[in-house]
Amino acid sequence: MKAKKTLCAIVAILVAILVGGCLYLDSLMPIITGYAAKNLASAVFVSGREQADVEGLDLNFSFIRYTRNRVDRKARTVTSRFLWRKATAVYRDGWGVTLLRGGRLADLQAEPYPLAPAVAVPERLTHGNPALTLRLEPIATKLVDEHAYNGTPFAFVVLHEGKLVAERYRAGMDEGTKLLSWSMAKSFTNALVGIMARDSLVDVFAPMDIPEWQGDGRRAITLSDMMQMQSGLAWNEDYGNRSDVNLMLHR
């Protein structure tokens, strides 16, 4: 009888561990499938890369490498599956790639993109400082062509005093290839907001007009606070687990 009770207890513990593991894994699956679908769709439909190249370089880590991905070039969608979960991302002109979370794909595809007035900008940057370009050539070669610093860089571009002094791209890519910027977008956004502040188009020290914040202390948070990451809001940006940033981006 004692042995039977012990066996039952062991089985119960193992079942509890199995159920707990499945529940935890299920909570991660929207992130796993969402990450794969969104990033593969952006790489294929925005950057013009091949599926196999993206899966071998960009998606070859953690659970992401085990997703099964289907690219539908006619519908311009990517569906990624992992075990019993799946996610679909759709490319739309102007909008780029969007994860489908609820709703109908046809409704999302039919949503119009509001075109803004075109702004004239220089098509190309001017080159300058040949001596500096010459000094950077060995670095560009080692980084992009020889992969001497680990990883697989897609592009190496250096600006100095507004002039282009170094430019090298991975095979199959050039200055027209659109690439995922990750946190580099923060620098671009800060620069654009700085231009708007200079031209009195925005007051970065005014409280942000977010309706959900008006009933508590968050109503005092300014755009400057947000841009300098000093808002005081609790935020977990660990990309390795079920964090705030992963839930925001991929769930």
Regions found by a protein language model. Name each.
Residues 79-80, 137-173:
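A short, well-structured edge-of-sheet supersecondary motif
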Residues 27-49:
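Alpha-helical transmembrane signal-anchor/signal-peptide segments
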Residues 161-162, 179-205, 226:
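Active-site SXXK
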Residues 1-27:
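N-terminal Sec-pathway targeting helices
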Residues 231, 235-251:
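A small/polar active-site loop signature that marks catalytic segments
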